[in-house]
Amino acid sequence: MLKLFSAFRKNKIWDFNGGIHPPEMKTQSNGTPLRQVPLAQRFVIPLKQHIGAEGELCVSVGDKVLRGQPLTRGRGKMLPVHAPTSGTVTAIAPHSTSHPSALAELSVIIDADGEDCWIPRDGWADYRSRSREELIERIHQFGVAGLGGAGFPTGVKLQGGGDKIETLIINAAECEPYITADDRLMQDCAAQVVEGIRILAHILQPREILIGIEDNKPQAISMLRAVLADSHDISLRVIPTKYPSGGAKQLTYILTGKQVPHGGRSSDIGVLMQNVGTAYAVKRAVIDGEPITERVVTLTGEAIARPGNVWARLGTPVRHLLNDAGFCPSADQMVIMGGPLMGFTLPWLDVPVVKITNCLLAPSANELGEPQEEQSCIRCSACADACPADLLPQQLYWFSKGQQHDKATTHNIADCIECGACAWVCPSNIPLVQYFRQEKAEIAAIRQEEKRAAEAKARFEARQARLEREKAARLERHKSAAVQPAAKDKDAIAAALARVKEKQAQATQPIVIKAGERPDNSAIIAAREARKAQARAKQAELQQTNDAATVADPRKTAVEAAIARAKARKLEQQQANAEPEQQVDPRKAAVEAAIARAKARKLEQQQANAEPEEQIDPRKAAVEAAIARAKARKLEQQQQANAEPEEQVDPRKAAVEAAIARAKARKLEQQQANAEPEEQIDPRKAAVEAAIARAKARKLEQQQANAEPEEQIDPRKAAVAAAIARVQAKKAAQQKVVNED
């Protein structure tokens, strides 16, 4: 009797709240064995077929690949994908994938060569001699993921379980209508499934292993019992048929009576669950050395002539599978990927088969009934009664429709498994699952944005803290430098202090006054003379620099002198026409005359020291002399006609100006004497030029005689100009005689 009670407690099962019993419709496809599908010509392999980030590409366009060759690298939680057959990579581009919105994801497109050649396979038949880490790494690198629908990387799941797993559950319930992929796999490959379960048990080392299967699969139950006849470590549990008993939380509660905590995982209560198809893929990866390149897919529905279960290569277009099964589409034909309750309608049929594709349902127009129009909620609570997660779907519906994300989160919308039981029983035909999916996606987007904002804030605060630390360190360095000067700074400070002390000592010496003696100012006089000498030396150096930069040009000097004379004449005329009350200060005039003499001496020195860069042309000099004589005669006539008797010429100024003119004439003669005559003057040309100059002078005199005297000529300047003209004429005549000789 005690053994009976122990056996009863050992095989006890629990029941969850809610659930429904829809028509199963499994007999359409579970009566025929698994079969192979001819290879498609073109395969589209999305890089992301699992939960997590996509892997890193390791192939490029034009590469030849073999079946089982990795297309991406799996690092961390990134799961690699493998080539489903041998062929050539023709493109790596975004392509629509198996998603309700057919979103485009980066995919590798391969053209098959028809040979279907494998890569070299290295199986581990003695897997028990391998370490736990080696087995997990092999499972991960061979691309094994959860094939029950979630697509979570199996290697990551096993690694996270660690040594705290007490119960390993194999999910063989397959509760959704129409789907028979796991049922047929257990009927045809029961031994391989059990071998995969043993590999998982070797990795996790659990206390018990449970296989949960619904009682509507008698053939699969018989095959498993036959394989497990001599095994006592694996227990087969047959449970009543009820939707959704295949859910992870629901099956865990049915077999163990434990509930997964809100927001937690099954590993928190010592339970880890794997699918039947996943166990089979683990066996092929470890023992056979074959990455996951195909899976069992159910082809069913009244629009398919030959329904059944097939081995479908990953990346095969859906259209290719349906056409092989005798697909007869109607005018408004729909194709559902997954079951009728949790699946989604495909926008078109060019999407590929992926790791989580377990069923392709092509119903006829009458099979699922006419679509009903959505109506208002009547608050009947039928959805709450059917919910297996003990939620309030009607409240979640209102919160989702009203964009009340906080209230939806408070009412545990994250615990919804999207089984569709609430929508199945709703008398108002409200697609509750669609509302819940959209609401969860919006909440996830909001949380992701908040996470990015928090990370950005953390980065900003870290940067501010770093800048503050750098600023504090910089200030500390400055303070240290101010408190502790460098060695050379110490020497300079000491020298300055010594000078100050010396001056103070000198200042404190008493001044002794002796009668009859003069004070000794020799030191002060010597210092003053030294400063003057230093100033003169600096001025001389500056003068030499200016002389080197500027070389005197005789022609430019003559032009500048003429401009100066013109400006002087204009100034004198203005002074002569000015009102008599403006008197000239003799002292200022004397100062200006002295400044002018100094400038003249400086200019003469520059011209004397400058190297003559250009030679004076004698012909030009002769012409200039003739022009000067003409101008002199013109000035004399103007002076005689227009000079006012009241203006008297100062003899001293005239003498000074005459001396300046003589000095300029001597300087010009020296330049001409030092200049090497490059060209000989033709006497005939010189005579012609002189005649032309005299003609121009006479013409100018006539014009001046006829013109009304508008301007008053300064007699002193006229005298100076006449003297200069006579000197230039005499010099030109001498030069002409020298050239003729």
UniProtKB/Swiss-Prot annotation:
It holds the Pfam family Fer4_7. NCBIfam families: PRK05035.1, rnfC. GO terms for cellular component: plasma membrane. Keywords: 4Fe-4S, Cell inner membrane, Cell membrane, Electron transport, Iron, Iron-sulfur, Membrane, Metal-binding, Repeat, Translocase, Transport. PANTHER family: ION-TRANSLOCATING OXIDOREDUCTASE COMPLEX SUBUNIT C. The gene is rsxC. Its EC number is 7.-.-.-. Part of a membrane-bound complex that couples electron transfer with translocation of ions across the membrane. Required to maintain the reduced state of SoxR. Belongs to the 4Fe4S bacterial-type ferredoxin family. RnfC subfamily. GO terms for molecular function: 4 iron, 4 sulfur cluster binding; electron transfer activity; metal ion binding. Its cofactor is [4Fe-4S] cluster. InterPro entries: 4Fe4S_Fe-S-bd, 4Fe4S_Fe_S_CS, Ion_transpt_RnfC/RsxC, Nuo51_FMN-bd, Nuo51_FMN-bd_sf, RnfC_N, Soluble_ligand-bd. The complex is composed of six subunits: RsxA, RsxB, RsxC, RsxD, RsxE and RsxG. [4Fe-4S] cluster 2 binds at residues 387, 416, 419, 422. Binds 2 [4Fe-4S] clusters per subunit. It is a peripheral membrane protein. Its main location: membrane. Residues 369-397, 407-436 form the 4Fe-4S ferredoxin-type domain. [4Fe-4S] cluster 1 binds at residues 377, 380, 383, 426. One of its GO terms (biological process) is electron transport chain. Residues 627-654 are annotated as: Disordered. It is found in: Cell inner membrane. This is Ion-translocating oxidoreductase complex subunit C.
